[in-house]
């Protein structure tokens, strides 16, 4: 965004909101001269100042950068859903948007330019602000290796198509040969300017839960049967691989000890939690402890760059496998029954991804952990043989009570609050199912409505709380402050 366009926008918003220059300067904590300099286009506000401007005018960063400043841009009306293969992606952590996505983008760019001798990559938005913590720069260099690669972090640019935007340049003999503008939009999926991605193709006819449920009732089928009819019987081979990876991740996480990488000094807790059974432990306490241990195991493996499955993202990947494995062991469900539950969960995740977002950089942690909780509640509902109405209520309930949840990872690492949050969401998914057993008939809010609400809420969140590590715990935490 040009400096002068910043000035025009600020002046327009002042007029619309009836805020004087002096009052706005006080709100922002800057001088009137500084504000005037912005308005004239002589200087540009810092990223923190832009975040404060967004808060002052009740705008998201996206709307401030791209919109008129008067109303929210609407998400395009979707047409169907992608394959569930785009929901569950097997890869390495710690972040589907900050490691898996950039890795894919770099791989595509490298294949396009096999004969160059230098790459330059510029990270913008959340990729820049939390890229070091997530290891984005490391994965970029590793993927483009052995070609000489420099990575730059641009913290100021805001006129971006997505908060996770990166730009790549290829050189031969110091001459620019090619460039690419790309976005990592969550769950390991990417968009590239000027390139049609095969994975973006919709294969499901319906894009709302209402329509899917009506179709299932009309044809007397379960959601997983709708998946099988659409994807083909080989989808079970894919889901078998997904489930195997999920279980292996829990097993590895439970058996590994030590300190997680990144400098925050977080110790692994999954194995300790799993072994801490007490002689007077109630069945309910044991259930919570084991489910949490499984969720911690996945979260810790992800934080260490281990092999995980996005569900819907790396940062929220511990919720679904934790609950599925616990109930498989408790009730003896077959692998095929678990796979059917995973198919059901994937449809819920795709509905959120299509009609809202699963990206913490776009809509905060509600988009990641809230979606994971909803997916897990729906999967559990399928395992328990619940009705479509009960499954919908459980999934809706799971998202509703994560609305407004912030994404403010300390040091930009997927550790605090991310790992513990997976465990809490796993327990919440079970609570949502328990409520659905009794209260489904009295519900007033649909799953489609709560997904729409989540998207609007996410766009209203300050950029500080959308995976930029510039607000909340990420801002206030200091390693010298000890817990009493």
Feature names for model-found ranges:
Residues 1-17:
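A short, Lys/Arg-rich alpha-helix, primarily the initiator
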Residues 18-37:
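Short alpha-helical DNA-recognition segment
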Residues 48-63:
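DNA major-groove recognition helix of helix-turn-helix/homeodomain DNA-binding modules
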Residues 118-154, 343-381, 388-394, 400-432:
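A structural-propensity feature for long, helix-poor, extended segments
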Residues 143, 149-281, 289-290:
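C-terminal regulatory domains involved in ligand/effector binding and gene-expression control
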Residues 247-364, 472-484:
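Accessory "access/gating" subregions that flank catalytic or transport cores
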């Amino acid at each position: 965004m040009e400096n002068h366009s910043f000035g025009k926008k600020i002046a327009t918003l002042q007029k619309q909101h009836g805020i004087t220059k002096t009052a706005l300067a006080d709100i922002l904590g800057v001088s009137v001269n500084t504000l005037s300099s912005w308005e004239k286009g002589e200087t540009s506000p810092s990223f923190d100042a832009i975040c404060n401007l967004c808060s002052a005018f009740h705008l998201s960063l996206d709307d401030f950068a791209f919109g008129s400043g008067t109303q929210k841009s609407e998400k395009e009306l979707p047409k169907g859903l992608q394959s569930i293969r785009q929901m569950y992606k097997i890869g390495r952590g710690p972040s589907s948007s900050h490691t898996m996505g950039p890795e894919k983008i770099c791989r595509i760019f490298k294949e396009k330019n096999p004969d160059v001798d230098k790459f330059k990559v510029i990270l913008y938005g959340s990729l820049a602000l939390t890229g070091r913590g997530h290891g984005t720069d490391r994965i970029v260099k590793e993927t483009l290796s052995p070609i000489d690669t420099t990575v730059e972090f641009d913290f100021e640019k805001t006129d971006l198509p997505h908060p996770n935007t990166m730009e790549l340049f290829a050189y031969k003999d110091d001459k620019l040969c090619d460039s690419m503008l790309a976005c990592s939009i969550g769950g390991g999926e990417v968009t590239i300017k000027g390139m049609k991605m095969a994975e973006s193709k919709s294969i499901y006819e319906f894009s709302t839960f209402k329509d899917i449920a009506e179709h299932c009732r009309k044809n007397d089928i379960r959601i997983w049967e709708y998946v099988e009819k659409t994807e083909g019987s080989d989808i079970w081979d894919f889901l078998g691989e997904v489930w195997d990876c999920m279980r292996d991740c829990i097993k590895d996480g439970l058996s590994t000890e030590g300190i997680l990488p990144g400098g925050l000094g977080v110790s692994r807790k999954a194995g300790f939690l799993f072994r801490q059974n007490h002689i007077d432990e109630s069945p309910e306490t044991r259930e919570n402890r084991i489910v949490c241990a499984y969720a911690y195991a996945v979260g810790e493996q992800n934080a260490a760059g281990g092999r995980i499955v996005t569900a819907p993202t790396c940062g929220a990947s511990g919720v679904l496998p934790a609950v599925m494995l616990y109930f498989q062991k408790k009730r003896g469900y077959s692998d095929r029954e678990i796979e059917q539950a995973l198919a059901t969960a994937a449809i819920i995740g795709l509905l959120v991804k299509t009609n809202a977002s699963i990206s913490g950089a776009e809509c905060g942690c509600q988009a990641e952990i809230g979606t994971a909780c909803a997916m897990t509640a729906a999967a559990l509902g399928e395992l328990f043989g619940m009705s479509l109405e009960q499954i919908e209520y459980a999934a809706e309930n799971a998202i509703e009570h994560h609305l407004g949840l912030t994404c403010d990872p300390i040091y930009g690492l997927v550790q605090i609050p991310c790992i513990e949050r997976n465990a809490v969401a796993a327990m919440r998914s079970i609570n949502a199912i328990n409520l659905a057993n009794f209260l489904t008939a009295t519900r007033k809010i649909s799953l489609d409505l709560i997904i729409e609400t989540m998207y609007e809420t996410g766009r209203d969140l300050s950029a500080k709380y959308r995976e930029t590590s510039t607000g909340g715990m990420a801002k206030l935490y200091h390693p010298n402050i000890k817990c009493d």
